Amino acid sequence: MYHPRELYPSLGTGYRLGHPQPGADSTFPPALTEGYRYPDLDTSKLDCFLSGIEAAPHTLAAAAPLPLLPSALGPETAPPPPEALHSLPGVSLSLENQELWKEFSAVGTEMIITKAGRRMFPACRVSVTGLDPEARYLFLLDVVPVDGARYRWQGQHWEPSGKAEPRLPDRVYIHPDSPATGAHWMRQPVSFHRVKLTNSTLDPHGHLILHSMHKYQPRIHLVRATQLCSQHWGGVASFRFPETTFISVTAYQNPRITQLKIAANPFAKGFRENGRNCKRERDARVKRKLRGPEPVATEACGSGDTPGGPCDSTLGGDIRDSDPEQAPTPQEAASASAPPCGGPSAEAYLLHPAAFHGAPSHLPARTPSFAEAPDPGRPAPYSAAFLDLQPGPGGSAYQAAPSVPSFAPHFIQGGPFPLPYPGPGGYLDMGSKPMY
């Protein structure tokens, strides 16, 4: 870069508005002075606008100090600090689960953050005193960075590994009871167990957004306000607890923190040694999945005492047929009509639905009163094809109604029913409707 006076030495060492001066520079031709004369730059025209510009070049200097205020106004007072403008005198906050936080802090607290959001454990649980019982207050919580470093797990400890990521948008969690009276807040401890941490910058649920591998600390704010969105606040008090500092991670780095959270978190009981999600149980489930479904050892159809179907547990065992010699058992009917099968699932497709409920799969056999082999040229009468009709009383032309099968009371009075099943303790009113 060059200074203008180095590029145009003919302009002199100073700058001024006006006509070129012949004597200012010996290298400037005097004959050209009149050619570079501009009438608009006459001194008489510029005096009203540029009266402070001197004709000779000068150096810039600091501006003169402003005059002091008159003594009648008195000395100027310094503005009060922000803490004095927004404060709640006499209000104190204590951490209820301080011992638990200290136990984690001694090891190095880690908090899991996920895209969907993960709750904090331990959660912030505080007790407040010194509030006005009649006034209304808001309880807020936010999480702020502790320092400007990024951390990494190196060996058996955390150490800084570089500069922190740019700060994410600040979000505040509002306690769902807000606003409430001071008597309500002081009646019992205030818990922030619903706070969720996320690493998604596009989170639409209002969770607190954090960077992974950064150190944070929760802050709890108590605001005196009558409404949630009030612009007139009566005072603000903020509290921090050193033992609540944590490092956000996507997976636990310290094995001691993992064991401590399993032992202290009541919702992690499945990951304990006697839980369903312990390592031994997880490995066993993986092996079973890789091995495939185990074959079920079953006997041939009709060889057992009870039918092997999906509804075996509903059998009552108190069903008796009126004529066991005439009515075969469900096992005999299944074995006579179905080939040997290898499992209960195949038998379920071969048996009549009534067999699963212990009922005969067909009406009881009766001695027919017609010829066994009717003439093929003539169609069989209706009574011979479907019902066993008996002559009515007095030799009338009307036939008596057929008798009710012996298994019908089982479906009417209670017990297992064909579809639809009744509710617990209920009965299915069959009435005069057909059974199938």
UniProtKB/Swiss-Prot annotation:
Keywords: Developmental protein, DNA-binding, Nucleus, Transcription, Transcription regulation. PROSITE patterns: TBOX_1 (PS01283), TBOX_2 (PS01264), TBOX_3 (PS50252). The keyword Hydrolase does not apply. GO terms for biological process: mesoderm formation; mesodermal cell fate specification; negative regulation of neuron maturation; negative regulation of neuron projection development; negative regulation of transcription by RNA polymerase II; positive regulation of transcription by RNA polymerase II; signal transduction involved in regulation of gene expression; somite rostral/caudal axis specification. Residues 100-273 bind DNA. One of its GO terms (cellular component) is nucleoplasm. Disruption phenotype: Defects in the differentiation of paraxial mesoderm. Irregular somites formed in the neck region of mutant embryos, whereas more posterior paraxial tissue did not form somites but instead differentiated along a neural pathway, forming neural-tube-like structures that flanked the axial neural tube. These paraxial tubes showed dorsal/ventral patterning that is characteristic of the neural tube and had differentiated motor neurons. Embryos lacking TBX6 show also randomization of the direction of heart looping and independent alterations in the direction of embryo turning. One of its GO terms (molecular function) is DNA-binding transcription repressor activity, RNA polymerase II-specific. It is found in: Nucleus. Coiled coil: none annotated. Residues 332-344 have a biased composition (Low complexity). PANTHER family: T-BOX PROTEIN-RELATED (PTHR11267), T-BOX TRANSCRIPTION FACTOR TBX6 (PTHR11267:SF100). This is T-box transcription factor TBX6. It comes from Mus musculus. The lineage of its organism: Eukaryota, Metazoa, Chordata, Craniata, Vertebrata.
